[in-house]
From Swiss-Prot:
Residue numbers bearing the Omega-N-methylarginine modification: R47, R105, R120, R134
Biological processes per GO annotation: cellular response to cold; cold acclimation; positive regulation of translation; regulation of translation; response to cold
GO-annotated molecular function: ribosomal large subunit binding; RNA binding
Pfam families to which the protein is assigned, alphabetical: RRM_1
Modification Phosphotyrosine, positions: Y158
Family matches, as InterPro entries: Nucleotide-bd_a/b_plait_sf, RBD_domain_sf, RBM, RBM3/CIRBP_RRM, RRM_dom
The protein's name: RNA-binding protein 3
PTM sites of type Dimethylated arginine: R105
Task of the protein: Cold-inducible mRNA binding protein that enhances global protein synthesis at both physiological and mild hypothermic temperatures. Reduces the relative abundance of microRNAs, when overexpressed. Enhances phosphorylation of translation initiation factors and active polysome formation.
UniProt key word Nucleotidyltransferase: no
Post-translational modification Asymmetric dimethylarginine, affected residues: R105
Amino acid sequence: MSSEEGKLFVGGLNFNTDERALEDHFSSFGPISEVVVVKDRETQRSRGFGFITFTNPEHASNAMRAMNGESLDGRQIRVDHAGKSARGSRGGAFGSYERGRGYPRGGGDQGYGSGRYDNRPGAYGFGYGYGYGRSRDYGGRSQGGYDRYSGGNYRDNYDN
């Protein structure tokens, strides 16, 4: 049995929910081998999601069914099996919301500069489909196309 089988993704966490609170809310379903609340690398603040690994996959399934959609520290949480997405078949920039949101196996915070979502050189990899680059690549538009909805150039009013 792989530990991945008993691993759950927990999303929508209150930013003040820590590992101990998460474990307290899930421990009634069975023995837990690991609890991780993913934190921002620079600020050490919660990113609003985490992972819980049960020693028995059946306990994890029971916890998922019981806790998905429940309230924890004032926030409705989403609980799903972790790492279920097929890496090559994620749809769109967000991945598949129903299959673990495409977070990589092993969890952990790869940070904004990891290129996890956008493999182009110079891109920051925010994961939202914008792909802001370090040079003149602004989501596939040139610098002149600052506001695609206005139809104008952001320098129009200043360079005349």
